[in-house]
Amino acid sequence: QSFKNFDKCFKSNSLGSQEVFKFCLDNNIKLIYSATSASLGNNGKDKDLSPYAFTKSKNIEFLENLKKWFNFKYEVIYFYNVYGPNQICKGDMATVIGIFEDHYRQKKALPVVKPGKQTRRFTHINDTVDICYKAWKKKLCRHYSIANKKTYSILEVARMFNTKIKY
């Protein structure tokens, strides 16, 4: 989506994030930064695959420099396919599980791109909120990667709904 909405992506992830960083720095507020696991793949080389991954990874570099220059306090949390109540179920930003949930509720077959073997790691929203709170309480300036250890193929996830699947 960041290719299609480059301006929005850049304004939000670069300019918007820098404003938040500055506000936290000016007001001595510790930041909990939501990073993206999209920039971690392929030994970090995936950070250049999209404007989204690139801008998010540049923000990490900027945070590291703010720490060196101003002793800026933050915790960085990498999220993996968060799901749970009120997840996005429709539109360009819908999650895989959200799309499946929406189709399931409408009694439609779940859409899976063949062969369905693409794998993902998922994290429930409650676990995400819990680790954000725990990270905020610590004063470590660390990076946390939040995901279930088990990976699932998209087809495995679709089959968990016990309904029709459309390729």
Residues of each region from the PLM?
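C-terminal substrate-binding subdomain of Rossmann-fold SDR/epimerase-dehydratase oxidoreductases
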Residues: D102-Y167
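N-terminal Rossmann-like NAD(P)+-binding domain of SDR-like oxidoreductases, especially those catalyzing
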Residues: Q1-V82, Y104, N126
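Hydrophobic alpha-helix immediately C-terminal to the catalytic Tyr-X-X-X-Lys motif of short-chain
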Residues: K58-L66, V96, F100, V157, ...
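Glycine-centered flexibility sites
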Residues: G16, G41, A53, G84, ...
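Short, electropositive, low-hydrophobicity segments enriched in small/polar residues
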Residues: V20, S39, S57, I88-C89, ...
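Conserved alpha-helical elements of sugar-nucleotide-dependent glycosyltransferases
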Residues: G16, V96, S153
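Glycine-rich "substrate-gating" loop/helix at the edge of Rossmann-like oxidoreductase active sites
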Residues: L49-Y52, Y80-A94, K114-I125
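Short beta-loop-alpha junction of Rossmann-like oxidoreductase domains
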Residues: N43, P85-I88, L155-V157
